[in-house]
Amino acid sequence: DTARYPEAVSALTDLQSTLTKHVTALEAYNERTDGGGVKEALKEAVAGALGVAAGFYDQLRPTDKVSRMIRDAYTATSLAAISYHMLYTTALALKADDLAALALGNLSDLTDRIGQLSETVCTVVAAELTDEDKTIDPTVGADAVRATQAAWATMEETS
């Protein structure tokens, strides 16, 4: 029941809004791009990114637990993010600076959303487990957020 998890609803709504914006921008780019030659390779890359973003909507199932919805959204968003890596690299290689900027901007949007989802899933899982077993301490969600975010921060420090 999503009504019990306003932070999850907020994260998923933010993601949906972001992906809608991405689809609109990618479609606009696709419409103003002529077919053929070098442009055809870009069209394929754009179409791939569009497909990932559009496919996200099909993965949200209202009958699932909220934690599963977040997990599925995280997975789809990670796929979209790696697609933007590929689109950005393709655009750079083909000297399509406007598309490179679009891909990098969209990737930046998604990194924020992935972070939001990764924090939210911990508190939602803890709450769902508490619903199933009242002996579970729901504050472990906040502990999990701190530890998992620290793990990501450690990865960033070493790269």
Model-inferred region functions:
Residues 1, 45-95, 99:
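Acidic/histidine-rich alpha-helical segments that form the ligand environment
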Residues 3, 7-10, 14, 37, ...:
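A structural signal for alpha-helical segments
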Residues 24, 28-71, 133-144:
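Carboxylate-rich helix-loop segments that flank metal/cofactor sites and access channels
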Residues 100-159:
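Hydrophobic secondary-structure block in the mid-to-C-terminal portion of proteins
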